[in-house]
Amino acid sequence: QEAPKAFNQCQACHKVEAGEDGVGPSLFGLFGHKLGQAPGFKYSEAHLKFAQQTVDEPFLTKYLADPKASLPGNKMVFAGLKNPDDVKAVLAYLKTIK
């Protein structure tokens, strides 16, 4: 599946290939895993504090819309996707990256 236009903001820092980190960790196989699990990536204390959080649709819906409110203290500079259709498109795309 082709990445939606809204995903361009994510690609500024994240890669979708397994084990290929950018400024942020790879998003490959993100769904169903716990936060802060990409091997070798140095996560913020905020991500480590929420390391038991499973990355699922309810969590990512909130996180993509407002990362700072969903995960206080995280280092991501991304302000969030304000359009709910963009959030849905990015979620659908992320589910295919595995």
UniProtKB/Swiss-Prot annotation:
Family membership noted in the UniProt record: Belongs to the cytochrome c family.
Gene Ontology cellular-component terms listed: periplasmic space
MF (Gene Ontology): electron transfer activity; heme binding; metal ion binding
Gene3D superfamilies linked: Cytochrome c-like domain (1.10.760.10)
SUPFAM superfamilies: Cytochrome c (SSF46626)
Residue positions where Pyrrolidone carboxylic acid is found in the record: Q1
Protein known as: Cytochrome c2
Binding-site residues, heme c: C10, C13, H14, M76
Pfam families (UniProt xref): Cytochrom_C (PF00034)
Keyword Ribonucleoprotein: no
Principal subcellular localization: periplasm
Lineage: superkingdom: Bacteria
Keywords, alphabetical: Electron transport, Heme, Iron, Metal-binding, Periplasm, Photosynthesis, Pyrrolidone carboxylic acid, Transport
Post-translational modification, as annotated: Binds 1 heme c group covalently per subunit.
Protein source organism: Rhodoplanes tepidamans
Keyword Coiled coil: no
Membrane-traversing stretches: none
Function per UniProt: Cytochrome c2 is found mainly in purple, non-sulfur, photosynthetic bacteria where it functions as the electron donor to the oxidized bacteriochlorophyll in the photophosphorylation pathway. However, it may also have a role in the respiratory chain and is found in some non-photosynthetic bacteria.
Annotated localization: Periplasm
